[in-house]
């Protein structure tokens, strides 16, 4: 897929004579269109179909989390083991590396960094847009804005929970209970932020002290749950969309590069490897789409887009070659391939580490409540990374 490297002139000529066969390459690429299309469709539709079949059943949430962790490993391995090394090899080819400025600076790493920063910018912009849209929607529905932070009052309510230590008549806890409560709250705040000091399964009971000394008990534990859940769903939808952009971008590069190639020795194993590649990558994207809760039309559109992108890229590459006689081993072709591949790698690394692995392992209530689930999820992450990395032996 990338440059051939610095080989002696005689060896390079012999390899070129044996492997470069335009007619055989065209037949292989034409046959690969259906295989890659089916593999892509199976990979992305399988998690979506299983989600529809098992939604609401016992173990569904944990199963979906494991699929997502496996998917994160696949995407991380795709970016670091497949995309970035190919991009670096293209820019390190003798036809490119002997020219300036390509020999003076590691452009593969630079553009990978640019890709990650661009993904962060898109993430921040989308988050700000969703936040503003949410406030605007609340205003249209006539809902009151969130209350301002409470100020100090001499008779402020004392929030307690049904599981909290019992207050003595004096309003203070015993030293032993106070130390235990302080340690627990401190750990919760350190791990999950200030809002997590009260667990989601607890109902906050706030004794509202009135002017006449009586107490009105108000339960407020369930008020903010719907808004937080809706915000999490919006975030997941945004993650899925940005992730699909990065994967589709990468798939176009793969398809166009393969379509322009006339090297039969490279195309033959590449067809098999790309088929497995699309299955695993599709499972990764499909798991994220399934968790985001899109409508049927949006899910169908995203599945179709992923399925047809690589075959369309192959057709585009074949068309470019036949119309222009474009040489896939020319310096300009290698530079374009290397820069676009590096950019795509940075996007995928950011999405895997920040929007998938970090969210699941450090900000997921279900994950934080079970050490066994953490271990199994980590194993799923490693298996996803390993399954995709093994394919680097052939592609």
Swiss-Prot record:
Zinc listed as a keyword: yes
User: What GO MF terms are annotated?
Assistant: zinc ion transmembrane transporter activity
Q: Keywords for this entry?
A: Cell membrane, Ion transport, Membrane, Signal, Transmembrane, Transmembrane helix, Transport, Zinc, Zinc transport
Q: Which GO terms describe its cellular component?
A: plasma membrane
Task: Using the UniProt annotation, give all residue ranges assigned to the region (Disordered).
Answer: 132-163
Biological process according to GO: zinc ion transmembrane transport
What is the protein name for this chain? Zinc transporter 6
Could you tell me which species this protein originates from?
Oryza sativa subsp. japonica
- The primary gene name is ZIP6
């Amino acid at each position: 897929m990338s440059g051939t490297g610095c080989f002696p002139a005689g060896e390079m000529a012999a390899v070129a004579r044996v492997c470069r066969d335009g007619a055989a390459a065209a037949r292989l690429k034409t046959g690969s269109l259906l295989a890659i299309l089916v593999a892509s469709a199976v990979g992305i539709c399988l998690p979506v179909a299983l989600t529809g079949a098992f939604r609401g059943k016992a173990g569904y949430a944990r199963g979906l989390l494991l699929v997502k962790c496996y998917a994160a490993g696949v995407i991380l391995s795709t970016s670091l083991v497949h995309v970035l090394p190919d991009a670096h090899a293209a820019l390190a080819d003798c036809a490119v590396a002997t020219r300036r400025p390509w020999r003076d600076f590691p452009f593969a790493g630079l553009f990978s960094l640019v890709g990650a920063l661009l993904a962060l910018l898109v993430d921040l912009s989308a988050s700000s847009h969703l936040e503003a849209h949410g406030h605007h929607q609340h205003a249209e529905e006539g809902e009151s804005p969130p209350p301002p932070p409470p100020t100090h009052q001499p008779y402020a309510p004392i929030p307690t929970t049904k599981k909290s230590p019992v207050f003595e008549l004096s309003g203070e806890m015993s030293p032993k209970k106070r130390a235990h409560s302080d340690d627990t709250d401190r750990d919760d705040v350190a791990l999950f932020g200030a809002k997590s000091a009260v667990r989601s399964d607890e109902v906050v009971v706030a004794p509202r002290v009135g002017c006449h000394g009586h107490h009105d008990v108000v339960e407020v534990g369930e008020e903010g749950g719907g808004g937080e859940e809706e915000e999490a769903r919006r975030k997941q939808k945004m993650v899925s969309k940005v992730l699909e952009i990065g994967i589709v971008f990468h798939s176009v590069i793969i398809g166009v590069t393969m379509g322009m190639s006339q090297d039969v020795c490279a195309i033959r194993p590449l067809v098999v490897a790309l088929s497995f590649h699309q299955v695993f990558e599709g499972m990764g994207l499909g798991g994220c789409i399934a968790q985001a809760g899109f409508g049927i039309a949006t899910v169908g559109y995203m599945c179709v887009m992923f399925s047809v992108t690589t075959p369309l890229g192959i057709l585009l590459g074949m068309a470019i070659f036949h119309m222009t006689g474009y040489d896939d081993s020319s310096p300009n072709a290698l530079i374009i391939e290397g820069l676009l591949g590096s950019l795509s790698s940075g996007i995928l690394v950011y999405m895997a580490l920040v929007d998938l692995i970090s969210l699941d392992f450090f900000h997921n209530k279900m994950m934080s409540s079970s050490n066994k689930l953490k271990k199994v999820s980590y194993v799923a992450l490693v298996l996803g990374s390993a399954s995709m990395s093994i394919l680097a032996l052939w592609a």
